[in-house]
Amino acid sequence: MSDINATRLPIWGIGCNPCVGDDVTSVLTRGEALC
């Protein structure tokens, strides 16, 4: 899942939750507001 992390995380903030992998998709939907 490295590709997802390298492609998604930097978009909304890699410093927010670098441990997020499979949940990155869900986090982007709801976590976007949290960050």
UniProtKB/Swiss-Prot annotation:
Which residues are annotated with the PTM 4-hydroxyproline? P18
Expression (tissue specificity): Expressed in basidiocarps.
Q: Does the keyword Iron apply?
A: no
**Pfam families documented for this protein:** Amanitin
Q: Does the keyword DNA-binding apply?
A: no
Crosslink (Cyclopeptide (Ile-Pro)) position? I11-P18
Propeptide boundaries: 1-10, 19-35
Q: Which UniProt keywords apply?
A: Hydroxylation, Thioether bond, Toxin
Q: Where is this cross-link: 2'-cysteinyl-6'-hydroxytryptophan sulfoxide (Trp-Cys)?
A: W12-C16
Q: What does this protein do?
A: Major toxin belonging to the bicyclic octapeptides amatoxins that acts by binding non-competitively to RNA polymerase II and greatly slowing the elongation of transcripts from target promoters.
Query: What name does the UniProt record give this protein?
Result: Alpha-amanitin proprotein 1
Recorded source organism is: Amanita exitialis
